Amino acid sequence: MKPVHERSQECLPPKKRDLPVTSEDMGRTTSCSTNHTPSSDASEWSRGVVVAGQSQTGARVSLGGDGTEAITGLTVDQYGMLYKVAVPPATFSPTGLPSVVNMSPLPPTFNVASSLIQHPGIHYPPVHYAQLPSTSLQFIGSPYSLPYAVPPNFLPSPLLSPSANLATTHLPHFVPYASLLAEEATPPPQAASPAQSFNKSSSATSPPGQLPHHSNTQPLDLAPGRMPIYYQMSRLPAGYTLHETSTAGASPILTPQEGQSALEAAAANGQRQRERNVRRESEALDSASSKGESQGLVPVVECMADGQLFSGSQTPRVEVAAPAHRGTPDTDLEVQRVVGALASQDYRVVAAQRKDEPSPLNLSHHNLDHQGEGRGSARNPTELVEKSQARVFYPQSHQEPVKHRPLPKAMVVANGNLVPTGTDPSLLPVGSEILVASSLDLQARATFPDKEPTPPPVTSSHLPSHFMKGAIIQLATGELKRVEDLQTQDFVRSAEVSGGLKIDSSTVVDIQESQWPGFVMLHFVVGEQQSKVSIEVPPEHPFFVYGQGWSSCSPGRTAQLFSLPCHRLQVGDVCISISLQSLNSNSVSQASCAPPGQLGTPRERPERTVLGPRDLCDSEGKNQPSGEGSRVGEPSQPEPGAQACWPAPSFQRFSMQGEEARAAMLRPSFIPQEVKLSIEGRSNAGK
């Protein structure tokens, strides 16, 4: 017979019973303590129920708690009713069994045989694994296929105890849950329910003793809402991307505590790679521009060459440094944060070399630094000349042309170098390509008053687009024609319809080499007055000859730059000129070698007018009288195929009548009235 208190205890629920600890239980506790010594790392993982062996008189089960609760004298049926157990904090009071089993009502597929309870004479129901409490580790499977290969030492040591044997073959399929990775290596905080959305958290620095391969390789750019990903160990040298995982002997520069200095250190370690990449980049850029930018390109060239990204974009294998498709958009934001940090340290982004990247960095994206400077350098024309000349005169350059902007007069570009007009011509390299913009003697002298009485040809920042093959020219009759299809009759009819203009002729009497390299000097006899005019033009500049069409001193170079078929200009050729009809019967002629549609600026002398689509910066850029406020013609855009308006409609629309026009034409000038004409470039008429 059992004592009365034992029988009364059986009628009570398990939680209400008094559970005295007998000497037998104490003995078993002592023996079990010698068999299993819990470690501090395993304390969070060994919470559960310890099932004790049974004696001849009945089953005795000790619940691991604070040592204050125990169940004695339970029958097998009563024992099977136990399903919820207490959670021990850090110590155990097992009853001498060789194994410790976590218990919980899980599906039957997780049940284990009762052979864990070593008693051959009694049949016991199956023992269940205990469900992990809310404070313990939880794993979730990725809702998408992970592109990351997780190494065996993926989890920090506070999360897995040495006694927990989790198959390493399953590890690549798990990712740490959000709250398990804390800012410091503290006990695991409360984890959210697995039903919650997948969140990312900051990384924790794991103890160095348990993770020898990853103890010093935490990601550098971590913020709330980001999840660190541990990659396979990299076998690359230290000069590559910063987020790679190195071997056990990794350099300490990659520790999170030195994240800021790691950027500089990694840049220093990759010096050889950068030098190799700088040479590769310099082949793609113009020599002058790349030399000026080389110091700023060094840190970033390492990023862009061969598709590498200096921000350490995350990929399945760190050895492949090109950005990969990511499962979540948050990782793209991580890259932006790192790139932003680099930009704040005065790193220059040259993503424009990558044409296929829409780049959120922008790395953005895709513009060169000097290109942006060229667009905004109207206040500094000298800098614009220096930066844009390579785009203009070297078609093989990969840089895009910029819009035309007015340039200072009397400046020379020789082989990409800006040369003042006072420079001795003998100092300029022979064969250097110099383009000229039309300039008045007065303006040239005002620019360099003390240097030279007769200024040299002035610079041009781009090729005139209206000479490009396919450019559309609008005649005075309203008809549109391509520049290569123009004929002599088109000029004649346009001058007749215009009213204020008349066709004149300019005969070539001599062609000489100019004192300025890259130019030729042409001598003309113009109009009825047989005025002698000398101009200096590039040899590729086209002229329109009666009955022949476009001609130039160098047809091959004209075809190369403009794709415009030309004949060779020779002595005796008669070029088309347009004369402005004078109201007082004094003809002020304007010799022309270009079709209608000339660009004009209102700053030049009042008596000047223009014929043809000549460019402002090219030697044929001529201007309408500023006093009259008229402009002979103007192409819409300085680009190939752009439409250029013929001078006549604009002239009629803006020209002034009566005494105002008469006064403007009789205004005194430095050149005599009867020889006031200009075909293109600088004119020596009347000197």
From Swiss-Prot:
Comp. bias (Basic and acidic residues): 1-19, 272-283
Stretches the record annotates as Disordered: 1-46, 185-223, 261-294, 356-379, 587-649
InterPro entries for this protein: Ataxin-1_N, ATAXIN1-like, Ataxin_AXH_dom, Ataxin_AXH_dom_sf
GO BP of this protein: brain development; extracellular matrix organization; learning; lung alveolus development; memory; negative regulation of transcription by RNA polymerase II; positive regulation of hematopoietic stem cell proliferation; social behavior
SMART domains with a match to the protein in the record: AXH
Entry GO terms, CC: dendrite; nucleolus; nucleoplasm
GO molecular function annotations of the record: DNA binding; POZ domain binding; RNA binding
Ranges where the record places region Self-association: 20-197
Limits of the AXH domain: 455-586
SUPFAM superfamilies in the record: AXH domain
Protein purpose: Chromatin-binding factor that repress Notch signaling in the absence of Notch intracellular domain by acting as a CBF1 corepressor. Binds to the HEY promoter and might assist, along with NCOR2, RBPJ-mediated repression. Can suppress the cytotoxicity of ATXN1 in spinocerebellar ataxia type 1 (SCA1). In concert with CIC and ATXN1, involved in brain development.
Note: Its overexpression suppresses the ataxia caused by polyglutamine-expanded Atxn1. Competes with mutant Atxn1 and wild-type Atxn1 for association with CIC. Decreased association of mutant Atxn1 into its CIC-containing complexes decreases the levels of mutant Atxn1-containing CIC complexes, suppressing pathology, while promoting aggregation and thus increasing nuclear inclusions.
The name this protein goes by in its record: Ataxin-1-like
Protein's organism: Mus musculus
